[in-house]
Curated annotation (Swiss-Prot):
UniProt: Zn(2+) binding residues: H131, H135, E202
Pfam family, one: Peptidase_M48
Cofactor detail note: Binds 1 zinc ion per subunit.
Cofactor annotation: Zn(2+)
UniProt GO cellular component terms: plasma membrane
Gene: htpX
Annotated membrane topology: Multi-pass membrane protein
Protein name: Protease HtpX homolog
Keywords per UniProt: Cell inner membrane, Cell membrane, Hydrolase, Membrane, Metal-binding, Metalloprotease, Protease, Transmembrane, Transmembrane helix, Zinc
Coiled coil, from the record: none
Active-site residues (renumbered): E132
Subcellular location per the Swiss-Prot or TrEMBL entry: Cell inner membrane
UniProt-recorded Gene Ontology molecular function terms: metalloendopeptidase activity; zinc ion binding
Length: 285
């Protein structure tokens, strides 16, 4: 429940930030235009982002004939989660990783790299796919798409303010210092909120995935193994399209940074600790 409340508050914050920046650029008319642009971008992302991401990663759809064990595993977990059977994809990449996409449970897809199938045991793989199906069940793909779109739009509006300035309610030019401050700080604030949303949804998918599989320890073991392997194996497509990193079960990008604030995923150690606590207590709330 806490993660859902936190997500709702963060979504409200990123929307408010977007509208406020629009207002600073063009007053009440700017706020209205900014909101309409955001709605249009979210609509496009909602309908087409899954196709774009799967094509971007050159994901190949598989079925029971081409990947029988993997396909049956997903089907069994989808049944346990009371979800429609998603489309199943494989990505020919060495880094162990996986993600879910699709605008709703009826149009969902799950994808895994060939690397993750080589590295994980069947039990660990069940934990990973249960995590991805939890994202589908919670409609996290929609949430992450909206937050990413809004963060990108905030950055675009901030750049507009930097180069063209803004107007107040009476149409007079806005304070140029304020415009520069907005241009510098707003994209950072938008990105921080987006990443906080992503971290909250990962925790919730860990909890939901453990509930679907009934085996939180399997997911904990999988996360530990993925973390150790992924850090030493580059994922070129993800590096070229870093905005898609938040979709993965583990951050696929190399490099460091301010771990707690500028990460799309919670610390692996904290995720494992929470899962092991679920395994010990049998509680998933």
């Amino acid at each position: 429940m806490f993660n859902w409340v936190k997500t709702a508050m963060l979504m409200a914050a990123i929307t408010a930030l977007f509208i406020v920046i629009g207002g600073m650029i063009g007053g009440s008319r700017g706020m209205t235009i900014a909101l309409l642009i955001a709605l249009g971008m979210n609509f496009f992302s909602y309908w087409f982002s899954d196709k774009m991401v799967l094509r971007m990663y050159n994901a190949q759809e598989v079925d029971e004939a081409t990947a029988p064990q993997f396909y049956r595993m997903v089907r069994e977990l989808a049944t346990r989660a009371n979800l429609p059977m998603p489309r199943v994809y494989l990505i020919d990449e060495n880094q162990p990783n996986a993600f879910a996409t699709g605008r709703n449970p009826e149009h969902a897809a799950v994808a895994a790299t060939t690397g993750i199938l080589r590295v994980l045991s069947e039990r660990e793989m069940r934990g990973v796919m249960a995590h991805e199906l939890a994202h589908v069940k919670h409609r996290d793909i929609l949430i992450s798409t909206i937050s990413a779109t809004m963060a990108g739009a905030i950055s675009a509006l901030a750049n507009f303010a930097m180069f063209f300035g803004g107007r107040d309610e009476n149409g007079r030019p806005a304070n140029p210092i304020a415009g520069i401050a907005v241009a510098l700080l707003a994209p950072i604030a938008g990105a921080l909120i987006q990443m906080a949303i992503s971290r909250a949804r990962e925790f919730e998918a860990d909890r939901g995935g453990a509930q679907i599989s009934g085996d939180p320890q399997a997911l904990a073991s999988a996360l530990d193994k993925i973390h150790r392997y992924a850090s030493g194996i580059p994922f070129q497509t993800a590096e070229e399209h870093p905005a898609t990193a938040q979709m993965m079960i583990m951050n696929p990008l190399s490099g460091g940074g301010l771990q707690n604030l500028f990460s799309t995923h919670p610390a692996t150690e904290e995720r494992i600790a929470r899962l092991m606590d679920m395994a010990r207590t049998g509680r998933f709330d």
